[in-house]
């Protein structure tokens, strides 16, 4: 039934393409870190002709035990957004996670698959520098919302498929412990055409009519028995990224036999708008999911 309704729900979202996430230039408060943490800001993790991407690291003081790590990827339809607008990391600080908060190339800088390449390079950076950072390479989680959710899914689901690992540290084992997908895009082609998403078409650029290419940058393409566990959260009134994208992902994960948890927030829009009180509930449920996996 969910699959039957998918196309209808996507078509209903056509009126929402103008609501795709955008940001205005403004100052954001710096992330407040605990006393037993230190930070490294604007660390260059990937570069190439005409670009240089940076990340922020919030690092727990070293102990005899290695720490888990979580990579956070901001949203914004691949056209806008910034690591500087991100926050809400306290649940992870309280549980000893290193937090890696990244920038990546926007559509105006480079079309698909550049953002995927950058997100993969952030993972490679953590893997390559794990010893110096005091983290466990087997307990790295990747997380994002909206377009960031899409990039988190791509980063983790590619596993050791290195097709997009350009301008990265040379790391063979690119598997992650888990993925946190918050209202992310799972099928770029469907979102571009059923929902008439300007963001998706702009990101695809001159390949926007190439369905085969769009599938190569769609998380659904890479699901398999070795895929990492995935936590999913989505509002059932999301008119920007229809919840059917998450239903399809969740159903396929269950079919394959991959551990997953889908949190559906009633009456919530994109980014859980209209139900912000559920953000805390989501964080708690994410931590339970990661605890069950032994990540921390």
Predicted regions and their residues:
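Alpha/beta-hydrolase superfamily serine-hydrolase fold, recognizing
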Residues: 19-296
